[in-house]
Amino acid sequence: MLEKCRAWLDAHENEMIEDLKSFVSCCSVSRADLAAPGAPFGPENAEMLNRILWRAARFGFETKNGNGYYGTVTLGKGDDAIGFIAHADVVPEGNHWIHEPYNPVREGDFLFGRGSSDNKSACVSALYIMRMIKELNLPLRHGVKLIVGLSEETGMQDMVPYNLAEKPCRVTLVPDGRFPVCYAQKGTLRARVKIARGEELAGFEGGEVDNMVPPQAECVVRVSAEEAKAALTASGFLAPEYEVSSDDAGAKIVAHGVASHAAAPEHGKSAILMLADALEKAGLVGGASLRAVQAIHFFAQGCYGEHMGIACEDPDTGKTTMTVGVARTYGDEIELHADCRLSVAANPAQMAARFEEAARNAGLDVIETKTTDPVFIEKTDPRVQALQKAYFEM
């Protein structure tokens, strides 16, 4: 049977890659701010889901569009199925690509494009595994269901309507982790805080989504562009990381960092932190605006949450991480969003209490905190053992 499967997969490799290219070419960043009827996460995500379901229907599968929140592809009995759950939304593409992020290019055994790994390849893989089972008429004692989500990168709002409308699968596999089997997942702590911006800071903006180290941040200070540039240069904040230009309200300063997923913030460089650091050390603001900048600098520093009292580490999932991914100005206030991934050894409620206390001590008002519990399955669990055995045999 394994030889038949290998032969089928080899015969369909190019077709599979072409489907992956089609999926990757869709800019499916989850955008609830662009919601429309049937497209709660924006038009590009709606198009992404339609492409997947259309392809699945061409293979002869039963498909369902969950009103734009999710999609399902079913083989056999859906009420007694093993599920694959994958997501078709992506983190914003950021900069520094060697190829266009939504014009996928194959070089040898690699496909370059946003989402080619996380997680559209999982959608394609699961779809072709189901197609292989169907076309080879492989015997199964259960159904198989592919569940496609569209909001994994922004809080999993897609799974709320799914869980309300659909019967849970007998067991569900998540092809979005490391080889061979992930048996643990960190808990989460997501937070929004705010602080008054003061009169000398006309605006402060940074980042695109909560779960990415922000590659760019900008602000407007009420001095001339010449004064701002001179102060920054004297303090060692130089181009190309910092740019200064004139603005109607004063000087616009842009900081350029390096994007990285919130799961590994140590690989990035926060432009929000860079900008706050420059404003503080160059002496470009004072009074309430200086207090705001100092609070932002405190909040956005580091990668592991030590300053917020939430540092924790375990041998299975490693260190708790913290990313301040977004800064926005709303009226007279600056709002900051934090995405924390909590070690499985951490107590989420306790971490949230510590986090809130540290934020208030820094002069920040806490708007909200939300937590999810970690997941941990013993390595001796039969499901883990079965998956490891299958993966190593294949």
Predicted features, each with a name:
Residues 102-115, 249-259, 394:
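Glycine/charged-rich beta-loop-alpha catalytic/anionic-binding loops adjacent to active sites
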Residues 153, 159-343:
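Midchain, well-structured core segments that form catalytic/ion-binding scaffolds
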Residues 348-365:
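Redox- and metal-dependent alpha/beta enzyme cores, enriched for Fe-S-associated oxidoreductases
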Residues 245-254, 367-380:
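Short proline/glycine- and acidic-rich turn/helix-capping motifs at secondary-structure junctions
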Residues 1-85, 90-93, 335-337:
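N-terminal helical capping/dimerization or prosegment-like subdomains
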Residues 58, 80-148, 154, 165-166:
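Active-site metal-coordination/substrate-binding segment of hydrolases
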Residues 21, 53, 124-131, 160, ...:
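Predominant activation on well-ordered alpha-helical scaffold segments within soluble catalytic domains
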Residues 227-243, 375-394:
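Active-site-adjacent substrate-binding region
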